Structure formats: structure tokens, C-alpha cells
A protein has these predicted regions:
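Claisen-condensing/thiolase-fold acyl-transfer catalytic domains that form or cleave C-C bonds
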Residues: 89, 93-141
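Active-site/ligand-binding loops adjacent to catalytic centers
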Residues: 2-104, 147-177
Length: 177
């Protein structure tokens, strides 16, 4: 699967221009896997989705502007673009929070959900290095975390933030420090 590294014809966003100007360190191209939420998966479907729906609001996009770039990254690297369900995304979110201590917004959990799905299907070989970008912090979408039924307590109450004045000593006390 791996091919010799080459500068991509499509560097992505403007900040990526600087990155591709640096000397190459990699000797092989990584295999790019992408995962779209099943209710908003136009690349997987092969056509725009007029009413995309998913808990992963940051990827609730029915006709992505970077469609061709995503397909090119997949095709040039021998990768895949597949769909993951909201349930798989939520399970990955819970795993990241409980096992890794990483609080992400749902869209950032989609890559983890995809790797879990591929591993369960035997399609993610052992002994490989897997890199998943989880850039969206959970506070990016706090209403989701507060109101999500999967995160409610036994009384059906959502998580409630602790509000304290904005001073270091009070915040430290609230955190038990």
C-alpha cells in the first residue's frame, strides 16, 4: 500500500502550504482513511445529501467543499472513505472520554469510531501505527454534552456544568485542588 512520499498536488488549507515546503522526512505515503457520519455521508453515497443528519454537527455537511481533495487523498494513498453510525460515534466518544481522558466533540470521535469498526472487521492490521486527528474539543459543542441522552445520569438528567467565579483560587477549590 505505501508509496514513496511526494508533495501533494492539493496542499489543503493555506496553512498547509508551509508544511509541504519543509524537507520531506517521511519515506512512505500514509494510507488515508476517512469516515463520514452515516446520516451525512455524501462521498460514501456518491452524491450530495440534501438533508444531512447526525449528532456530529461539525461534519453534518451534505456537499463538502473539499470533496475532490478528499477523494484524491483516498485514491492517491490507497485508502478508504466509509460511513460510521451515530451509535458508533457515541461509543467512540465514550471510549475516548473514559479510557483516554480525551473530551472531544462528536465529529472528532468519528475517526476513532472508524478505526474501531475496521479493527472489528479484521481490516486494521496489528503492528501498524495509526494516527487519528481529534482536534475538536468537547467544549466546542457543550449543548451536545449536556443534553445527550447517552451521557445522562440514572435520573435522566444531563450533565450540568459547575459554575464558579473566574478566579484561580475558586476554580482550584471547585476542582478539588
Amino acid at each position: 500500500y505505501a508509496q514513496p512520499w511526494k508533495k501533494p498536488a492539493h496542499p489543503g488549507n493555506p496553512a498547509d502550504d508551509d508544511a509541504v515546503e519543509l524537507p520531506a522526512v517521511a519515506t512512505k505515503t500514509p494510507i488515508m482513511w476517512g469516515f463520514q457520519a452515516a446520516g451525512a455521508a455524501p462521498i460514501v453515497a456518491g452524491h450530495p445529501i440534501t438533508e444531512p443528519e447526525t449528532v456530529a454537527t461539525a461534519i453534518r455537511i451534505g456537499n463538502p467543499a473539499s470533496w475532490e481533495k478528499a477523494e484524491a487523498a483516498r485514491d492517491e494513498s490507497g485508502g478508504v472513505i466509509e460511513a460510521v453510525t451515530d451509535e458508533e460515534i457515541l461509543a467512540a466518544h465514550r471510549w475516548l472520554s473514559s479510557k483516554e481522558g480525551v473530551f472531544v466533540e462528536p465529529a472528532s470521535a468519528s475517526g476513532v469510531a472508524g478505526l474501531i469498526k475496521k479493527h472489528s472487521a479484521g481490516a486494521a492490521p496489528a503492528g501498524k501505527t495509526w494516527v487519528i486527528t481529534v482536534t475538536g474539543h468537547g467544549l466546542k459543542d457543550p449543548d451536545w454534552a449536556i443534553n445527550n441522552p447517552a451521557l445522562q445520569n440514572e435520573n435522566g438528567e444531563g450533565a450540568q456544568p459547575t459554575q464558579v467565579p473566574q478566579d484561580v483560587e475558586t476554580v482550584a477549590r471547585a476542582l478539588g485542588l
